[in-house]
From Swiss-Prot:
It holds the Pfam family RNA_pol_Rpb6. Keywords: DNA-directed RNA polymerase, Nucleotidyltransferase, Transcription, Transferase. This is DNA-directed RNA polymerase subunit omega. One of its GO terms (biological process) is DNA-templated transcription.
Length: 90
């Protein structure tokens, strides 16, 4: 297992405060959202995996925002389809 240094990850993000926010969002996605890791897990915790993904350039704030927007649009489309189906059956 390769060690992740905060400095390497900070260089990808810009500052350590944004790094904490991005890593926490990504770790939460893996922990509670059922999202798969983009790097081999190697028995690491979600926070370490998130830092490794950031360090490798696989996860950025823009990537997280785009994924969340897409998921929200898909959820809204499913809800609209369900409402339309209910209204159509009446």
């Amino acid at each position: 297992m390769a060690r992740v240094t905060v400095q390497d990850a900070v260089e990808k993000v810009g500052n350590r405060f944004d790094l904490v926010l991005i890593a926490a969002r990504r770790a939460r996605q893996m922990q509670t959202g059922g999202k798969d890791a983009l790097v081999p897990e190697e028995n690491d915790k979600p926070t370490v995996i998130a830092l490794r993904e950031i360090e490798e350039g696989l996860i950025t704030k823009e990537v997280l925002d785009a994924r969340e927007r897409q998921e929200q649009q898909e959820q809204e489309a499913a809800e609209l389809a369900a409402v339309s189906s209910i209204a159509h059956n009446r």
